[in-house]
């Protein structure tokens, strides 16, 4: 990305535009600013200022390195909210997360899942609702699994149960 592009977009725009970050959805500014949603997260006001700044200027030296983690943890909370589930639902229906590599799943759309809610434990995986298996995504993503957490697919499908189609039972 050229420096002129960096200078004309917000940190969130810049971050979401990085190759490999396509699993993430945009967390609205009002959600990020709500102190209730920040509860329990370690952060510095400078990081929040960088994330919410309408224009990013990476040459100013105001990037601290913790923005990715902080945005990721807010993202994990947001995708469990009604608005977040709607945003992830759109991405799921478009197939943004990829499809199950298991042939018997017939290219079932998948969801991102973290194997841990603790930052730095593992990268994101994809979860198939048909075979209930987790796989490494085909996309070139190195997102931390904590940005989604281990319970996201369960929450998603409990709120939208008609989206799953179980594998055909060969005994019937």
Curated annotation (Swiss-Prot):
Q: Which InterPro entries match?
A: Casein_kin_II_reg-sub_N, Casein_kinase_II_beta-like, Casein_kinase_II_reg-sub
What is known about the tissue distribution of this protein?
A: Probably not expressed in wild-type flies. In males lacking the Y chromosome, it is testis-specific and constitutes the main component of star-shaped crystals.
Induction is noted as: In wild-type flies, it is strongly down-regulated by double-stranded RNA (dsRNA) interference mediated by Su(Ste) transcripts. In males lacking the Y chromosome, the absence of Su(Ste) locus, relieves such down-regulation, explaining why it is strongly expressed.
Q: Which domain of life is it from?
A: Eukaryota
The coiled-coil segments of this chain are none
Q: A single GO molecular function, which one?
A: protein kinase regulator activity
Q: What does this protein do?
A: Unknown. In males lacking the Y chromosome, its strong overexpression leads to the appearance of proteinaceous star-shaped crystals in the primary spermatocytes causing meiotic drive, possibly by interfering with normal casein kinase 2 activity.
Into which family does the record put it? Belongs to the casein kinase 2 subunit beta family.
Question: Which protein, by its recorded name, is this?
Answer: Stellate protein CG33236/CG33240/CG33244/CG33245
What organism is listed for this UniProt entry? Drosophila melanogaster (Fruit fly)
Q: Which gene encodes it?
A: Ste:CG33236
């Amino acid at each position: 990305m050229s420096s002129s592009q960096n200078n004309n977009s917000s940190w969130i725009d810049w971050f979401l535009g990085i190759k490999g970050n396509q699993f993430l959805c945009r967390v609205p500014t009002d959600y990020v600013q709500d102190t209730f949603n920040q509860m329990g997260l370690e952060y510095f006001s400078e990081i929040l200022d960088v994330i919410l700044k309408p224009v990013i200027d990476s040459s100013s030296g105001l990037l601290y390195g913790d923005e990715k983690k902080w945005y990721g943890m807010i993202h994990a909370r947001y995708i469990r909210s009604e608005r977040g589930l709607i945003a992830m639902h759109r991405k799921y229906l478009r197939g943004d997360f990829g499809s199950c590599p298991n042939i018997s799943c017939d290219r079932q759309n998948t969801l991102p899942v973290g194997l841990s809610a603790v930052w730095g434990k593992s990268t994101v995986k994809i979860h198939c609702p048909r075979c209930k298996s987790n796989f490494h995504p085909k996309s070139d993503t190195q997102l931390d699994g904590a940005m989604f957490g281990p319970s996201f697919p369960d929450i998603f499908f409990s709120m939208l149960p008609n989206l799953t189609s179980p594998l055909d039972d060969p005994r019937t």
